[in-house]
Amino acid sequence: MTPDDEAVAEVIALERALLTREVRSSAAALDELLDPEFTETGVSGRRWTRAEILAELLAEADAEAEAEAGQDRIADHTMAGRWLAADVVMLTFETDHEGRRVRRVSLWRRSGGRWRVLYHQGTLVPPAPAQETAPPAAQ
């Protein structure tokens, strides 16, 4: 594995950590992983600042803990990364959570020797149309 591959693997591990209830419920962990200039465009199209998303994630974690529902980690699929610049990696992946599939992209920036997510966007994947099934063949 090349150093570039190792860095992408590290960023993927950090993104997957962000999908865990443990990290999403920890202000300190989120503070370490979100870049000071972090912004997000959510599936609704709303733009979120770093402060807004921190508050939202912590509130969601509290609600999940109270309900004792949900899973410990949001399921992700096909996560892949590629370098965009010397210190910027883009991740693309899909998640399934609460009955919704979302296509996602995150930009991670390395600064001071550590990786932090700079930008994140989610786009809702519409449900696939129901497949019609052919009636059973006549005997």
Regions found by a protein language model. Name each.
Residues 2-32, 37-139:
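A beta-strand edge to alpha-helix "cap/lid" segment located at domain peripheries
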